[in-house]
Amino acid sequence: MREDIITALDYDGSGNLIYQGKAPAGSTKASALWTIKKFVYDGSNNLTDTQFADGNDKFDNIWNDRVSLSYS
């Protein structure tokens, strides 16, 4: 694991990872320095898709806004 990158994780009530964010070390969760992935599951809790905020892996999103961002 790279020490210059931090990771934030958010799980649903079933324990499934829903959001994974990465940002430069020292970033706050309110800064626009995050790349965020959303994990999509089917009704049987099988992972079916992985999507990026804004459809890309740029470090330009805010972790605290992860739920309201657009993913593709």
Please name every model-derived segment.
Residues 1-72:
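Viral virion structural and adsorption modules
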